Amino acid sequence: MVGRLEGMNDAIDEFPGLKARTLRFTCGAPRSARAIGDGSRALFLRSDGPEDTVTSLWMSVIGSDGDTDEILLADPRTLLADADAEDVPAEEKARRERAREGGSGIVGYSVDAAGNRVAFTINGQLFLTDIAAGVTRGIAIDEPEFKPVLNPRISPDGRHIMYTTGTYLVDVDLADVSDTTDAAEDAGDAVSIVASVPQDDADDVADTQDGTQDDAQSDAAESQAGEWKIGLAEFAAGEEMDRYDGFWWSPDSKYVLFETFDASHEQTWYIADPADPTKPAQARRYPQAMTANADVHLTLLELGYDTDGCYYGGIAHNVEWDRESYEYLAAVSWTEGHEPLLLVQDRLQQHDQVLAVHVGEPIVTMSAPENGFTDEDGSEVETFSIAIPEYAPGEEPGTTRVLEEHSNDCWLDLIAGTPAYTPDGRLVCAMNDMDADTNRLTVDGTPFTPKGLQVREVLDVTDNDVLCVVQRTPELLPAADLPFLWQSNADDHDARSFDVVSIRYDGDWEPLTYVPGQWTMSRAGDGCVVTGRGMDDAAMQMQHCMNVRTTDGDGDGVDAADMMSMVVSPIENHAETPGFMPNVRFVRLGERALYAAVI
């Protein structure tokens, strides 16, 4: 007993240093999982050990026979010699701070709709992984005006990568980048500026319609230094609303919605680097309470690509809403086959509007340029022009219409993943139901989630159900009304537990996580990835699950739908543990009986 106590005391003494070296015990743990394709594959990030901060890109695979494997897709140390000596742009550092990202290497990724290509950066350099070919190659961005590479997003069709420099929105045509080498490939003519920050306002941010970039570059050069940004989320969105993106591809890869904002009215703070006192303090715009916020604009950019998939020009349409009354752009959603959705809020966050952005069907579509012809004298004439799309009156893109409005005299909670369309066109929104004392979901304005099941995040929306993270309020949803799988530990499924459930539009629901804890999920096809931890274990858990067909005792294939079995593949976790288990007791305190933990 004495030796055990001494060991625990040693672990407690070592805890502060160990927590710092392991980035709060996250190094070596799998994270950022996403199920792709038919669900038999799942991407995730993980470093090699408990004190290794350099994160690699991995893929979990479940075969048709139920065999499982973990495949290393991209190792920063293999791709970049100085991967350990992280050197990322200042704007990227700021974005990571808002996202509470402390790792290095590959800290985020973007995958196309089919799950075949993945884009990411390492130390500000752009890379592309072709999963089927098993090749990862660097895309060298050499021109200074095309740097830094921030927040790259691959198009849903996998043919383009869009990123922002903060000053320019840049397109990379992957058709012009070689598929035959894993060495760094010079992007060359594959890179085009498609939009830039404006000089005085946000009315003219698109690239010139004749395909040149002179005006865009000129506007950016003359803009106020650092006041206007393009393709980035403003501080309030990232820090307070958990919105970190500043541009969004359309599902058909033909459009991009992008944000521009003017931060010149915000206060300037000067942030020093405590790790390097020789560096001068950096100026950062910060929206202090009771002072002006950034002035946020949104633009719909119609993209023109030729038959080879190469960008030749774009047409910009201002997205119009009452920006004076609703200054916060809280969320953007774009479902295949439907118009993009916006959620905008007023300054006090007591009123919001759900808006549909009109994209429009042109009566004359944009066409590829005619590049050069011969005049009457037989002389070659250099030209470059594109056909500008024409729209019927009232069909011009960029106008918005209000689909729903919500009000709450106290506060409107933001529910991540809302608003969203179902594939068949029904509108799913969040609702602060004060009468039911519940954060609920509505479909076409009608609440359908149960009273007492507090919706915290929407993970996926289908025609049949909504996948979401919930907390239960026992006073509103008693144990007797819970599904069978929660009956044995009903008391622990309360405000302390973030559970994943499937809720159908008729109100029926079923839990998909059974152990009380903090959970999330990504699903695709017949597969999913569950990530989280229970209350009785400090270790992060990740499981890749997939329904596969089984065979009968003779080995013959069985086609019946009821002969499917669930394969559960645990993803390895190399993270450190604290070395001791704190003695925690939960109590209810105060007039409102709030949950508290006594350690």
Describe the function of each predicted region.
Residues G3, S60-G108, V177-D210, D214-F247, ...:
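Predominantly five- to eight-bladed beta-propeller fold
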Residues L18-W58, G105-A114, Y328-V332:
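Beta-strand-rich domains and repeat architectures in extracellular enzymes and scaffolds
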Residues S32, V54-T55, V107-G108, L257-T260, ...:
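Non-catalytic accessory segments flanking enzyme active sites
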Residues G37-D38, A113-A114, P156-D157, P251-D252, ...:
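Residue-level detector of Asp-centered blade-edge/turn motifs that repeat once per structural unit
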Residues A42-L43, V118, G158-I161, S253-V256, ...:
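Hydrophobic beta-strand positions that form the internal "hydrophobic ladder"
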Residues E51-W58, Q125-F127, T167-D173, H265-I271, ...:
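Structural motif
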Residues I62-D65, D130-G134, L174-V177, L303-D306, ...:
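Short loop/turn segments that connect beta-strands within beta-propeller blades
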Residues E259-R456:
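Beta-propeller domains
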